[in-house]
Structure formats: C-alpha cells, structure tokens
A protein has these predicted regions:
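Conserved N-terminal subdomain of the carbohydrate kinase-like
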Residues: 2-14, 26, 30-122, 267-270, ...
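Acidic-glycine-rich active-site phosphate/pyrophosphate-binding loop
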Residues: 3-8, 25, 187-202
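Charged C-terminal helix
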Residues: 9, 57-60, 234-293
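Short pre-catalytic strand/loop immediately N-terminal to key active-site residues, enriched for Gly-Thr
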Residues: 15-21, 199-213
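Glycine- and other small-residue-rich loops at beta-strand/loop junctions that grip anionic moieties
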Residues: 18, 84-85, 182, 212
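Phosphate-handling active-site elements
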Residues: 37-41, 199-200, 226-240
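Conserved phosphate/ATP/ADP-binding segment of small-molecule kinases
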Residues: 124-199
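Short, small-residue alpha-helix embedded
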Residues: 151-152, 209-233
Length: 293
C-alpha cells in the first residue's frame, strides 16, 4: 500500500472556543469538516467549562496566544477557508480581523456567538460585540446569526419570519455581504437568506429532538465546507441546512442536557477492512516449524 495518489483535501480553519463535551465549538467544526471530506485545523479562542447542560464559565485565550496559533497554522498549511465562532472579547476579535486583512481568504463564514443556549455565561463582551458589528461583519463572506444573535446585532426584536427578513436586510445595510438568519427556534424551522436586495426563505423538516447542541456551529461549518468544495453560496446554504437536519435526526442522547448532533451519520454502515488480513500462524513462528528431511 502507498498513499502517493491520495488527493489533499481542502484545509479549513476554525477559530472558536473549546467545549469539553465536544458538542459545539471547534470539536463540532472539525467533525463537520471531516464529514465533508475536508481537513480541519483550529485556533482556540477560549477554554470553556461546560457540558450538555450548559456553559458554566469561559476562560479567554490571550490575544497574543491566539495570534501565535494563527501565524503558526498559516505558515505551515494552505488554508482554503475560515469559520469564525466564539471570540470572547474585543482583543481576540481584533486579532482575527487583522489576520483576515493580512491573508485575504476566499471563503469566510462568521457564526456570531454571543450567549449560549443554556447557561448565563457571556461568550462575547460588549466591546467585542461592537467591534464585530462595526469591523468584522464587513470582512466575511456570510454571517449566520440565529434569532437572539440577530437581535444583538441589529438592536431589533426578531421573533418571526417577517422580522428575520428585516433583520437580514439591516445586516446587509450594515456591511454584510450575505446573511443567513437561522430560524431553528421557530415552530417551523425556516432560514432567511439575504444577498444584496435578494431575500429568500428556506423551509425544512422539524425534527423532534432535544439534541441540538452545536447545531449553529455545524451549520456554519457545513456552509464553509461546501464553499471550499466548489459550491456557490446559495447551494452551499441549502446543502448545509439539509445536512444539519439529518445530523439532528440521527443525533445522540449523551448526558443530562441537550445532546450533540451526529455529524458522521453518513458513515454508519460498516466498511470493509482494506490493508488488514490475518497472518497464518506458520508465517509468524518460522522457528517452530518442523525441519524438512
């Protein structure tokens, strides 16, 4: 066997926090990249204390350390796209913005994480939120806020599809190139897609499952993987939405709270073993074989 003909997959970078339960953050991103035949690398913005029951506390990575992680990665590998999640503070948001300005990546997806679904920990401080809104927003290919995140960014109430459309257009006016306002919190999961003056709604099947921990991370990472694989943005969003729906449907009940998605639902069929075979006993112990006469 040799690997001389193996094709190097797109290398995708996630810049986000670490979740010890591995349902969200960089763990969810890396699983999603792998499930889309991409190779993931990560720069960690924070260590969190959390489980499926919620976020207890957040410990931000020093900005100098975050910069060092980013520099080490870009010095070593060719990055095809960047996904940005939790940033924790203005210093880290500024470090990431400088990084994007320096290297001009083709595909950048921002999942603007401000507060956890469960728990009261702050995932981005007020100064950081303002910086994301004023500076980072205009530098990314697409931003994927859920309803509470859209409210944080726009300052308006976002409770239904009509308000989602207004919020999406407002984010475009604020400098975003493209927006997907995700409506997983609604009775009928509907996403609103905005590019320029174009506004579309994408409906989906409602999956009755409490296991949605990391769904936003998975969705944004799936969009990036599709973009890096050659899809146009609209198609990437549709494919990512279908993927997340199935990953929730096939999710795991792990822990006492909201369990994680199953990013690897496509790989559940047992694969034949290649390159592994039983070695006959006589081949293992030649000294024990009877001498020939």
């Amino acid at each position: 066997l040799n690997n001389h003909t193996n094709h190097t997959p797109p290398i995708l970078l996630t810049i986000a926090g670490f979740d010890p339960s591995c349902g969200a953050g960089v763990a969810a991103d890396l699983k999603t990249f792998a499930a889309h035949n991409c190779y993931g690398v990560a720069a960690v913005t924070a260590l969190t204390v959390q489980s499926t029951q919620g976020v207890i506390s957040v410990h931000a990575t020093p900005s100098a350390t975050l910069r060092a992680q980013l520099d080490a990665l870009v010095d070593d590998v060719v990055i095809a796209g960047v996904k940005i999640g939790m940033l924790t503070n203005r210093g880290n948001a500024s470090a990431v913005t400088e990084f994007l300005d320096k290297y001009k990546f083709s595909h950048i997806v921002l999942d603007p994480v401000f507060r956890p679904t469960a728990g009261n920990a702050e995932l981005l401080d007020t100064s950081g939120l303002k910086f994301v809104r004023d500076e980072l927003l205009k530098r990314v290919s697409v931003i994927t806020p859920n309803l509470p995140e859209a409210e944080f960014l726009t300052g308006m109430e976002v409770k239904d599809v009509a308000a989602m459309k207004v919020a999406g257009q407002k984010l475009i006016e604020m400098g975003a190139r493209a927006v997907v306002v995700t409506g997983g919190h609604l009775d009928k999961p509907t996403d609103v897609y905005c590019v320029g003056t174009e506004v579309e709604t994408f409906g989906g099947d409602h999956v009755k499952s409490p296991n949605t921990h990391g769904s936003g991370c998975t969705f944004s990472s799936a969009i990036l993987a599709q973009l890096a694989s050659g899809q146009q943005l609209r198609e990437a969003v549709i494919l990512a939405k279908a993927y997340v729906t199935k990953a929730i449907e096939k999710s795991y009940q792990i822990g006492k709270g909201a369990g994680p998605l199953n990013q690897f639902f496509r790989f559940h069929q047992e694969q034949p073993l290649r390159g592994v075979h039983e070695v006959p006993q006589h081949g293992m112990h030649p000294a024990a074989e009877p001498a020939a006469h």
